[in-house]
């Protein structure tokens, strides 16, 4: 059985380039990507970091992402979306909305987590990819950008 992934990264939603908004270009890209999803019906869409251009993105940039996820789910309800935080993203912000994104078959990994015995919580990072019959057909290790505080443990709550 073939597994079909779309792998993207570095969307930088909300970016201004020399004081000019790139929102229109982002809209064009997302429209194109939705058309590809509609035509090819991949098993998973992987968004590998730098979803937003800044750690605190404008509400318009967040709305653009969430509208895209809703539209993509409508076109390919079986498709899973896996998003990981990049160095421009807030890992906590990306994970914060995950309960809402589950409706759209989307999963986020923004930060690494540690078990009580100080070992890496691999379960948080390892994501199964399913076919339309909900059989596991692949695994994805979703490793976000690691900030030094996350590695040393100084970032614990």
Model-derived regions, located:
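Metal-dependent catalytic neighborhoods of phosphoester/phosphodiester hydrolases
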Residues: 18, 51-69, 85-104, 108-110, ...
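N-terminal active-site segment of His-dependent metallophosphoesterases
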Residues: 1-70, 77-78
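A structural signal for isolated positions on well-ordered beta-strands in alpha/beta enzyme cores
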Residues: 46, 80-82, 139-141
């Amino acid at each position: 059985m073939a597994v079909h992934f779309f792998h993207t990264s570095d969307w930088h939603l909300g970016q201004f380039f020399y004081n000019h908004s790139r929102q229109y270009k982002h809209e064009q890209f997302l429209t194109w990507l939705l058309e590809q999803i509609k035509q090819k019906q991949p098993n998973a869409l992987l968004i590998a970091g730098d979803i937003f251009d800044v750690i605190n993105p404008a509400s318009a940039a967040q709305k653009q992402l969430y509208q895209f996820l809703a539209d993509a789910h409508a076109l390919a309800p079986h498709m899973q979306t896996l998003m990981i935080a990049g160095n421009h993203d807030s890992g906590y912000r990306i994970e914060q909305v995950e309960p809402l994104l589950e409706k759209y078959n989307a999963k986020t990994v923004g930060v690494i987590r540690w078990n009580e015995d100080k070992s890496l919580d691999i379960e948080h990072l390892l994501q199964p990819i399913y076919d339309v019959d909900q059989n596991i057909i692949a695994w994805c290790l979703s490793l976000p950008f690691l900030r030094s505080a996350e590695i040393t443990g100084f970032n614990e709550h």
